[in-house]
From Swiss-Prot:
Protein name per Swiss-Prot or TrEMBL: FMRFamide-like neuropeptides 14
Tissue: Expressed in RID peptidergic neurons, and the sensory neurons ALA, PDE and PLN.
UniProt similarity note: Belongs to the FARP (FMRFamide related peptide) family.
Main location: secreted
Signal peptide (UniProt feature, chain positions): 1-20
Nucleus keyword on record: no
Ribonucleoprotein recorded as keyword: no
Single GO biological process annotation from the record: neuropeptide signaling pathway
Organism (species): Caenorhabditis elegans
Cellular localization per UniProt: Secreted; Perikaryon; Cell projection, Axon
Residues forming coiled coils: none
Pfam families referenced in this protein's UniProt entry, alphabetically: FARP
UniProt keyword terms in alphabetical order: Amidation, Cell projection, Cleavage on pair of basic residues, Neuropeptide, Repeat, Secreted, Signal
Length: 143
C-alpha cells in the first residue's frame, strides 16, 4: 500500500487537530521502529527529488508514525466511551453466562447420561411425563 504525500499531510493535520497539541516529530510510540532518516532529511529528499526508494521509505516511515499516533488516539477514545457508558462490566458478566451454558450443552451433547439410564433408570422429573409421580409408582407397586 502506497500513501502519497498529500495523504500523509492530511493524516498529520488530522492527528494534530485531534490531539489538540503539536507532537514533536521525533517522539511517539513508533520512534524506535522508525526508519533511520529523520523527518528533516525526508523533507530534503522529497524537495530535491532524490532516490525514488529513499523517498518512498521516508513517506512510509512518516505515514506509519502518523498511523500509530492515530491508532493511539482512537484507542483512547474507545476506552473513554467504554468507561462512560459502562460497557466493560456487561461484557464480563455475559462471558461467564455463556461458559456455563456451553458446559451444560456439552454435557448433554456427548451422551454423558446414557450410562446413567442403564444403571439407574429414569430420573425423578421424567416420571412426570407419564402423568404420575415417582412416589405413586412406589406406593402402588407399579413400574
Amino acid at each position: 500500500m502506497m500513501i502519497c504525500l498529500p495523504t500523509a499531510l492530511l493524516l498529520s493535520a488530522f492527528v494534530v487537530a485531534a490531539s489538540g497539541q503539536e507532537a514533536p516529530a521525533g517522539a511517539g510510540a513508533s520512534g524506535a521502529a522508525q526508519a533511520p532518516h529523520n523527518p528533516k532529511d525526508c523533507q530534503a529528499i522529497l524537495a530535491n527529488n532524490g532516490d525514488q526508494q529513499e523517498a518512498l521509505l521516508c513517506q512510509l516511515s512518516e505515514s506509519s508514525m502518523l498511523l500509530a499516533q492515530l491508532g493511539a488516539l482512537v484507542s483512547e477514545g474507545v476506552e473513554r466511551l467504554v468507561q462512560t457508558h459502562g460497557l466493560a462490566l456487561e461484557e464480563e458478566t455475559n462471558e461467564g453466562d455463556n461458559d456455563m451454558e456451553k458446559r451444560k450443552h456439552e454435557y448433554l451433547r456427548f451422551g454423558k447420561r446414557k450410562h446413567e439410564y442403564l444403571r439407574f433408570g429414569k430420573r425423578k422429573h421424567e416420571y412426570l411425563r407419564f402423568g404420575k409421580r415417582k412416589h405413586e409408582y412406589l406406593r402402588f407397586g407399579r413400574k
